[in-house]
């Protein structure tokens, strides 16, 4: 495995800063007087029969180094360093640590890179011997093949440091859902090989225009394997299918499931968005298919790629490093510094359990999971506690541990969550590290299986996640989050930069959903958690109903010890939700001095308080003050919710410079921004997603979600291609992000068209594969104008006004709204200013969604009459009045 020196230098600096004096511990040999500490030397070219006493006598494996450490650490009077030389350490078995591997007498066992080294702890199996198979794709591209170990489970493959894509595509037949799966319109899929390898994917997110979405809620993307295909009958794997389509409904007329989180079944009439992992789908460069039964990998190379000479890794180990203690005997005082963890996988989604999702990587599992798991007091036979669903594992995981630290490390090319610090994790530190190209969550902290631990050692308390760069995570299980926290106490999440995530950036809390049925949120031990000074942008790039910071459940016993969210800078959160999202049961939260702009919504929202003695007549206590935002909520103090002294801004230039500059990585950690392990040779960006189309006269409008996973190849433009005819329109990326649609002219009225989109880079050879095609739309005359927006209003700031409206109703079969004209007429001078508001919200939002825009640079003391009008392909519709306001 190759790793650039630039990456290693940046990480080495971060590791040294984060580790502080710990990294400078004494480094005498393993056999030296333990009063001065000791060093155990490890090298991929070492010998496990050797002593590890010096570099010339290095041991080979981490497990042998572990044995040497155990022989030294019973009476430590100095730190023990396990120094890893340059190279790759293949983990056929995980490094499994327990209390015997702990530091003692106040000292630490430090697993660290040797000076200048770039060690990689790998769960991969290298694949070599690629050769042309003699077969080609439908476009004539050569398929290459190589032998691989038969029966070895894997879902991910990496080539020269970049992630290959599993073979996937549109479902090639029309499906009708049945109790056990589907009836297909033809027997085409019955001829496909290895049907049990195939998965259907059900994408959530926001549906609009021609796009219909499903999932188990807009925040999810479940997937289920196929069990068999016979003729036109497709039988889905159990229990995934029943857990995803038969979730039990309440009988109280609430229309809710017993789990209170999402719907009873996958949406969009239970139709999958795409199909994945069949050799017959192998079409696009960069795609692979691993036939575990035959022991073969098939791959379509990217332009210029030479598989025979590439470093190809199948991710095969589920756990690389684990630390497991008990409440009475925790594993403790162990540090990891300057290491890279790569090539882990996770096998549950490939099993009959599939990925039957609830939220944030938690799934329902087991034969009766849909009817019992985590349903506790709400259904007979429900297991306790409420909300205890199956947690996504971490490829690096600890539980019942104390003072574990990860500093200056890289978590990348992983197939589950990156790092899981589970129940009983106490006073751990994650600092100065990089998390990217991870299939699931970046960092997991705590769990949801023990809301009120009875034993001190079971509490998750005092952990710090600071100064990390977390980006392009959740690239396979795209409902994942950058940092996910369950029930935890006195947590500090500060000075991280989190960007380019498909769903929520930070999620904290659990168990608030019972307020949907006027029942109290689940009592839990959480308190004293702080989320401060983080820089979060370009989150929510794919799914919806989340936020930059998503919270739920009880967070303390008062505002004094409840959750504190302060000093965060949050911008360009794409899909619908809230930049700071107080979801069900969010109680005792203080939200102050945050800077928020270019978001669909900045903050929301209060919920009824049903924790006794409250009866829902008041809300969960919240304090929202001194924020700088564009939403512009008026000051209020009612029902236990205070909203006060917040400032409307036009952008970051209107917020205090000290707040804006302080957010994100502190200066000494900003070298992490140059670390991108995804910049492998030949990498290309992931394809755009969720393409939707709307017809105009002789034209069509095409919208799509932008690429959030560019594999180190920044997207500079997007190309839309029409079929039939091949008409193409290319638009640069910044222009697209402003309007969120591409106009494709020169089409023939009365002809049905579909459209695909590619993400382009500065190099013509590095464009992505095309997106899935849109549904067909038929151009034709468009004459109907949109109606006037509803509920227009304005909130006044200092030189700014936040104008709100509900989107216009659009007649069926006519063009949807594409933008909005906000017009201000100065009542003193008669000057008229019109600002055209464009973007994802304006394109997507329906008439039930509050939409807003800020207009800046207005004259103090002047009165302005404000109107809002929708614009579609036919022109500008009638305006709605937002009233006359005087600028402060």
Explain the meaning of each model-derived region.
Residues 93-94, 318, 345-351, 393, ...:
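Short glycine/acidic-rich loop motifs that flank beta-strands on beta-rich extracellular proteins
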Residues 744-765, 855-874:
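Beta-strand-rich modules
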Residues 41-400, 405, 451-455, 678-681:
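Extracellular polysaccharide-degrading/modifying enzymes targeting complex plant/algal/animal polysaccharides
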Residues 332-343, 382-384, 402-416, 425-440, ...:
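Right-handed parallel beta-helix
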Residues 165, 171, 343, 347, ...:
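Extracellular beta-rich repeat passengers
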